[in-house]
Amino acid sequence: PGVNDVDSTKVRIFSYGGFNSPYKQLSRFVKLQYKEELVQHVSVPMLISIMTPEDRSGRSGDHVPFRQKNFAACRFTSANEHGNASNGVGYTDRQHTSGDILGIDTDFNGQIDSFFVDFNYLARNAVINGAAATIVAKGPKKPDFSISTIVGPGLIVEITDQTQYSTYRVGLRTLTND
C-alpha cells in the first residue's frame, strides 16, 4: 500500500518468534476467537492478518517489553499506515512520534476537523482488542503438556499440570503464521 491508502476492513497482529512461539500462539488464538465468537455479531467483519515480524520496520511498541519479561504479547495495527518512521527532511508521520500531527483544519475555521482516524474502524478494532484482553485475563494458565502418541491423522496430548480444568482445547496450526 502507498501513502494515504485506506483499508477499513483489515487489522494486522504483530508478535515475536517463530511459528510455535507463545507470542504467535496468542496471535492465532485471538484470530480464532474473533472468527468463532465475534464475527457473527458484527456488521462489518474484519480480516485479521498475523504478521511474521515482531513489529513494523523501524518501529516498536508496548508489546516488546512485555515479551522481554516473558509475557505472551502482541500488537494490533491498522492494515495501512501513513509513513515508515524515517526522519528524513520533509517527512511527516501520524504514528505516535514526537512530531505527531493530531489533525488538520480542512475548512480553515480554526477548528481541527480531520483527525486522520476512521472512528468506525477504531471501534471495530477496539472490540477485537477488548476481546483479546478479556480472554488473556480470564483464561487458564498455559499448561505443560507432552505429545505422547501420534495416532493416524491425530495425536494424543497429555496435560501434565494445570489439571484442575475438565477440558482443554488443543489447536493445530497451518504451515503459515495464520
What kind of feature is each model-predicted range?
Residues P143-D144, T163-T167:
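A broad structural signal for short, well-ordered beta-strand segments within beta-sheet-rich domains
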Residues K35, T134-K138, L175:
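Hydrophobic alpha-helix feature that most strongly marks membrane-spanning transmembrane helices
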Residues P1-D5, I50-P140:
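Active-site-adjacent mobile loop/cap segments within catalytic or ligand-binding domains
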Residues K138-I150:
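Proline-enriched interdomain boundary motifs that mark the N-terminal boundary
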Residues P153-Q164:
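Conserved aromatic anchor
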Residues P1-V64, K69-A73:
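Metal-dependent peptidase/peptidase-like ectodomains
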Residues R169-R173:
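Beta-strand signatures of extracellular beta-sandwich domains
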